[in-house]
Amino acid sequence: MDLEQDEWMSQRQRQQQMEFSRIGIEVIGSKKDLIVNSMKNHETTLTIINETYRIVYYDQYESKFTSCNIITFDGKDKRSIKKMKRVVQKLSNESTNSSHQFDLHSHALLQSSSSSSSSSTSSSPSLTSSPSSPISTSPPYHSSPQLLEHLLHQQQPITSVGSKPSFFVIINLYNDDRQSYMSEIVSFAGSFQFIEWRNDESWKEVFKLSSNLLTYHVKKNELARACTLGDINLLDEIILSGCSKSQLKEAQGAGYTIVFNSYTSYSSGSSLVVSGTMALLCAIVENGTFLLLSKSNITRFPMSIINMCSQLVELDMSNNRITEIPIEITELKFLKNLNLSDNLINDIPLEICNLTLLKVLLLNENPLNNFPSSIVELGTKKLLSFCRNILEGKSCETWNKVKLMFVGEEGVGKTRLCKLLIGSKYNKKKSSSSSSSSLSSLSSALSSSSSSSSIINSNSISNSNINMVNIKNENQVTGDTVSTEGVNIHDFKSKKVEFYAWDFGGQQIFYPTHQFFLTTQSLYLLIFRVNDSNFAERVNYWVHQIKAKSGISLPIIFFVGTHIDSCTPEQLSMAESILKSNFIKYSRVKQNVINFVSCVTGKGVKELKKRLIHESEKSRLIKKDIPGSYIILEQRLSNRGANQGRMSISNSASNSSSSLLNSSSSSSPSLTSKKSSSHLKHSQQQQQQHQQQQQQLQQSIKEKYIDYDDYLNECKLSYLKPHEIKDATDFLHNLGIILHFDSPKLNNLVVLDPQWLADVMSSLITFSHSWIKLGILNHSDLQSIWGGRYKQTLWPSLLKLLEKFEVSYQLPNLSKSLIPSLLPDDPIGEILEIKDREWVPLKLAMENNYVQVFGCDYHFSFMPLGFFARLLLRILLIQGIDIKTYWKDGVLLDILTPSDKIKQQQLLQKKSIFEPTTTLSPFLCSLSLTDSQNYSPLEPPPLILNSPRVNRKFISNSTSTTSTTTSTTSTSTTSSNNITPLSMSSITPYSPTSPRTPSFSSSSTTTSSSSSSSSPSSQFCGVGCHRNINKNNGSSNELIKTLTKINNQNGSSGELIKTTTTTSTSTSTTSTTTPTTTTPTIPIKNNNNKKLPINRTVSSLCLTAKPKLQALITFIKKKSFEQSHDNDSYKLNIQVRTYNTTIDKEHSVSLFFQQLLFTIDTLISGSYQGLEVTRTIPCTHCIQLNPTIEPYHFDLGDCISALEDGRSHVYCGNDPNTPVRIDYIAPDICLKKVPTFTDDQILYERQIGEGGFGLIHKGKLISNKSDIAIKSLILCNSNNNNNSNNNNNSNNSNNFKNNNNEDEFIEKFQEFQHEVFIMSNLNHPNIVKLYGLMHNPPRMVMEYVEHGDLYHLCQDKERYASLGWTLKLRLMIDIAKGIGYMQNQNPPIVHRDLRSPNIFLKSLDENSPVCAKIADFGLSQQSVYSVSGLLGNFQWMAPETIGVEDESYTEKVDTYSFAMILFTILTGEIPFDEYSFGKMQFINLIREENLRPTLPFDCDPRLSNLIQLCWSTNPKKRPSFTFIIKELLEIRIDSIQTSYFDSPFLKNYPASI
């Protein structure tokens, strides 16, 4: 084994030897074999000038090329004395001759160079002895490129023309008994170095001396070569590798000799060209103060200048190819003038401000991609001040860029007005291309001014006049308009302000995407046609759209009326009056915000400009106190694509992908300046430049957006501190430089080019193509939409990007995408058929008394377009539902009952009967929760749509196909959503009509005979059923029989198996349903508790005794401005129906209703914070009396107040004598499963705690004397709750409503109800039990845990010190079991507030059944797919839950918090107490820098690894609690065993036992 290892090592050593270049040393003399053989057995590598070599020692007869000589002598041979004399004499003579040959060689080289450059050297500055004149450098290779290229590319050996260095090795072995003549031999060595070889270790001295001689020799030759060629880069590399000043002085002397010999012998002029290398050597050796290295082809800043020229006062390095200024330049303390112009520098280090004597810094003609050129243009003093302010953390820079938003309806003149403000003429013929181009920047306008008549020289908004061009009046009066698709961005400047003008497309189809571009810190121009009789309605929409985006602060809105040429003074006066009375209140600015202009004559435009500039200054849109790092960040991002116009993409469909490259190339920043590029004439340099440009071009094309981690790196490179990043991001977002959203789907994305994003969005939803039918896009049609615009390889990425912005949703397993904004406005075609078939008219349902109805209405003062499209996608993710159909403003669904889920499980178990016999119609789909959880919120659950060429009915070779369907169910552990996609059958185009919006007050269209007799669940199959319908009816009938048998086996004798027979022909479609059993009559209680028989005279939907739960959610939009004060102008209507059952029996209804309301509230609070929202509840008594009229609506607060007053009902406003049960109209706020206690059943003892939620008392249940804890909700500032007397704890909830805001009252009660709801569904020994609740005030009666909480235990150091290691592990295990139980719920429970105060200790005996329990579920949520919200207690919270308001997260946040609890149990300390940062700094360090507590050094390695896994920054890396519990149990078992075997008892026990 050892031999094999030695052989492997030898092979490895030989392989490594071959990787290095070799330097040979010739060994001469009688003892050469000893030296050669010994040195071969040792590692002999060395590094010379950043290159590694291996020294190889050769015998003189091996005829290898060598660079050094070793001459050996036998120290115990007297003849060696004479040999030494002869050798020394010969070497001395060769040294003299080689020196002369070296001078001749260098002289000849310089002569060849000088003779070919004599014509150009005359123009170079002369070399003088005056100290005030810097040494001029103009390397000879500039004038003789052919010679230079030859010299640079030739392969020269590492040697010189002169003799090789030599040294002596005298063998004087100690184990040799002969007489030594060492002293005599050495006496004749003279100046030559020698080594005495005594033993085997002497090889080290030989190698050391060999290395030193070779290094010196190579560096000497390379110095000569660098000086001869004028290669400053090589000279700098040599100096930095380690050259003594004596070596440099020697090189300088040799260089001067060559230069002056050349001058006296060959130069005919009076001036002398001195190479840059000689100038640098002179500055180093003579400690010079001036150095000029211009035009020296330097590629990097020579660090030798910084290290060895500390006295420099003036440094000129212009006209080179330097790419970076080193931070170490600040070592040049005496530097006053620094010229770095005409290089390739991209950034300037802030530390340059430490050059306190610097007066002149020239940086012109540099790319400066990562440093604001505007600062450089202000001069050296301002630049240094700018850098110093950033380093010192000062915020004193001015930002004069203002985002100007042009909004309004289509055809009002936004684009024309924008061009007039820019200062350009308007050309009708060019308008189309101008509007379709992705961006018109000022620079492009100026560059084309000579060839385009539509551009004029005026390019700024200022107080000076602007040239206007008259456009024929008829163009405007006749309605000749320019259409902007999506958003176009322009920019125009004045001396005081630079506007970024955003021109929003006015077509309604683009409105849903506008929300991503509206920002708070903007100046809005709301443009409308004064001669439009309905202009108030148009203005009203945009005013509320802007207000909704601005939140609580009022935006700055200028109202600009156009087309005044065709208006009378009376019309203008009336328009102004309407604006003042209705809309001016929504603008922060009240004066001079109403403007009337003419885009034909330019009337009013000049005044509008002045007002915009004035208001920008007055309203502080021009910032004068921002950090300079913001400006650097903007510059860096602009370099990557955030600068508008840098990477424009043509909208012309005819453009090829190559034109995209060309257009991007023309707008990309140049890698070299114009001056420096003129010197790069060599083919290799040009090729390198071309490759760099292509590389940057490819990068610029890709970087339309970057991920957030990349953005954070840019922030770090911009000198932003972690706590400044959010403010900087918001600042640039509000200005429109970038787009970044804190929403769960978009927080990891930073859009660098908003114009590009607008183009991508508009290209998909534009009105100019008709490829998307009924909201469904076939990916095969993308060629017609994106072909020529974007490379086909980018299409999948673009689709994913649009999914993030909720514009499109790619349907899994299909090459199709859903475009919600392009869904039909109203139910039409098959959508209408499904709706009419599944949703029985309310009047008919109520007349037959087989249905119970409840719901609620959300009333909005305004709602932007696109709201319901976003809500729809969230509804699709709610579990336990079966989507029937949907359209733009509505969705119809079934709510799955427990029996449905049981049957689905049985269907899954018997899925073998559904062996595929033919292809299933493509519209059939199913989705389980397990599948949906594999999709992120960015990827909606799988939806399957049928082909647009296939009718929605079953298609077969025969004329009819019979199919059987069952209710959608799920397994016992997962719920399912069956999502019915829209039909893609051939439907004739439709014209939008008035909305068909079902509500409680209107009856639906009477169901046709065919639809009323069809099955409610027709055309759907269960989850996981790969069901296929045979082409013959026989097989289908067998399938029906099998399904019937399954249902009968399930005990559902009263249920129906519906058989749907569908006949597909070109002209007609029929459907029949045949019941298989007789359905008994089931009585249902109405609100008055009267039993009402169910009439079986309605459709087959109602004939079955099987309970059925349905919901219809619709959105009603206002029709006109006159309806703006109507409560139903914007209303979200939710209607839920239960057939053949009651709300009391089917808790699935309440659960769905709670999840639906939570989904709606989350969307509104996250994306529509500026809206006024109220929620009302319709009276079911009114609906039962007359479903055709509007019912009375209860206020939500009234229902809550009634519950708190102990009343189970409220009274109808239309019939005050009729009580209505609250649990029937608002089951979400009633928790009927939870027992209720009264005051006479509870005995209060003392207060034991207090928190933000309320007070906690210890008490007893009077019935069994058991200890309890009572948690009370604080509803007022009264101290009554502190009293132990039961009577004093009662409180009138109305007092709260009278003294506090009603919204706060509702919010607190809902939080209380939420915690009760969560706890009522938990039953685990490691979770504090809920016994019941009390009203007036709201209270929870819970299990009492006697040993207090973990926090106070750790604060008591004596108690904590008494905890044994195995007890600590037991506490960890108990807590892990409790959390694991919560995460195994369906859906999982996210506690969100796990910390030591919420961990209670049941026992401190590790052998007790229970030691620790989890409590306080006030912040808990059921994770449908993720939850969101900003949390406190940052020490315990996961990074994704702190610092960002709308960031989403899953149950993995509790895993992170559990790691902090483990740390607390392990150390007794609060996490992060070891640090002393501020809260915001803590949050940023935790989120961005992965700051974590320090684990004890003696922590068990397995526990340490487990904790680090649990607090991983990436939630996906955090382990499951199954794994966590297993690991903790193993650690505890090992600890117990170790403790047992280490016990004194075992140690003293006889070893034989």
UniProtKB/Swiss-Prot annotation:
It comes from Dictyostelium discoideum (Social amoeba). Residues 113-142, 643-696, 955-1019, 1048-1090 are annotated as: Disordered. LRR repeats lie at residues 287-309, 311-333, 334-356, 357-378. Keywords: ATP-binding, Kinase, Leucine-rich repeat, Nucleotide-binding, Repeat, Serine/threonine-protein kinase, Transferase. GO terms for biological process: G protein-coupled chemorepellent receptor signaling pathway; negative regulation of aggregate size involved in sorocarp development; negative regulation of asexual reproduction; nucleus organization; regulation of actin cytoskeleton organization; regulation of cytokinesis; regulation of pseudopodium assembly; signal transduction. This is Probable serine/threonine-protein kinase qkgA. Involved in growth, and during development, in aggregation. Disulfide bonds: none annotated.
